[in-house]
Regions:
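Anionic-ligand binding patches
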Residues: 1-126
Length: 126
């Protein structure tokens, strides 16, 4: 899973958890992202969370499920819930950040929730 920011050429991507360095924390990652987007107008702050869920099958087969949560990066942190970039991420169609959503609201639209639901649907068919 990772956060892709349009203005940063889809970075930090898979490096999201360590964007500010190998020993960084969520606060450092969020501070760096805000600094990198300083002065960037809202219409150019598009972003998405992406989750890729892969399964290696016996005999060499493999399956991949992908989930995305599109949105944009806010200009300041808001909310106490969630983790990581949630206080900065405004999901499409929402006026609140991911950190301001309940766990159930976030799961219904999240990239991880979408990927896992697709996997479970496939698993039930097997």
């Amino acid at each position: 899973s990772g956060l892709e920011v349009d203005e940063l050429n889809s970075m930090p991507g898979v490096r999201s958890a360590r964007w500010a360095g190998p020993e960084c924390d969520d606060a450092a990652n969020n501070a760096l992202l805000l600094a990198q987007l300083a002065g960037v107008p809202p219409e150019r702050r598009g972003a998405r969370f992406v989750c890729a869920l892969a399964l290696a099958l016996p005999g060499g087969g493999r399956r991949l499920w992908r989930g995305e949560m599109p949105g944009r990066i806010a200009e300041e942190e808001r909310g106490d819930g969630g983790f990581g970039y949630d206080p900065l991420f405004l999901p499409d169609g929402r006026t609140c950040t991911s950190a301001e959503l309940t766990a159930a609201q976030k799961d219904a639209i999240s990239h991880r929730g979408k990927a896992v639901r697709a996997f479970v649907a496939w698993l039930k068919e097997q």
